[in-house]
Amino acid sequence: MSRYRGPRVRISRRLGDLPGLSRKAIKRPYPPGEHGQKPRKPSEYAVRLEEKQKLRFNYGLSEKQLFKYVKAAKKLQGSTGQILLQLLEMRLDNTIFRLGMAPTIPAARQLVNHGHICINGKVVSICSYQCKPGELITVKPQESSKQLVESYLAFPGLANIPSHLELNKSNLSGKINGVIDREWVALQLNELLVVEYYSRK
């Protein structure tokens, strides 16, 4: 299953607030379609599937990509669910979004793909790059790159920057001081249900 490229608000109406996907307010807070307003009791499978879909759409991943992250999280020591969230949050595209350098993760992905972003002085065009403590994210020293990020910083997607990140607006840079804590993950979901979903497949 490839990455979703359809209407973002439609997905938000179905899954709830997905801060990384869209900044648009949900005018009708119920699922799309003629049966969207009818209350239904979902099955256990449907609940696990919905949590998995929240994760996939918020971070803009294909099914194959998310499955790879789950497998990687299981190999590391600690809570698989929390490690999974840390791996996704430390992606370069998400880190740019959380710094406020882009209003959404898709917008951050465009910055990376178009070569506007540097890490420790070198252009990095891989959205899935895993940011590490001690690294410095800067904007390419080109006027068009600076103007674009400055316009995004004026209206950030989220109000608060996580404690592991440090933004310097004056020189358009962000320092990574550690790994994100669970409490700073903006997406509301139960990550254990995502792990359960894949363990039952």
UniProtKB/Swiss-Prot annotation:
Its main location: plastid. GO terms for biological process: ribosomal small subunit biogenesis; translation. Coiled coil: none annotated. The keyword rRNA-binding applies. It comes from the Eukaryota. Keywords: Chloroplast, Plastid, Ribonucleoprotein, Ribosomal protein, RNA-binding, rRNA-binding. Disulfide bonds: none annotated. It is found in: Plastid, Chloroplast. Residues 13-43 are annotated as: Disordered. It holds the Pfam family Ribosomal_S4. InterPro entries: Ribosomal_uS4, Ribosomal_uS4_bac-type, Ribosomal_uS4_CS, Ribosomal_uS4_N, S4_RNA-bd, S4_RNA-bd_sf. One of its GO terms (molecular function) is rRNA binding. Residues 90-154 form the S4 RNA-binding domain. One of the primary rRNA binding proteins, it binds directly to 16S rRNA where it nucleates assembly of the body of the 30S subunit. Part of the 30S ribosomal subunit. Contacts protein S5. The interaction surface between S4 and S5 is involved in control of translational fidelity. Belongs to the universal ribosomal protein uS4 family. This is Small ribosomal subunit protein uS4c. It comes from Porphyra purpurea. The gene is rps4.
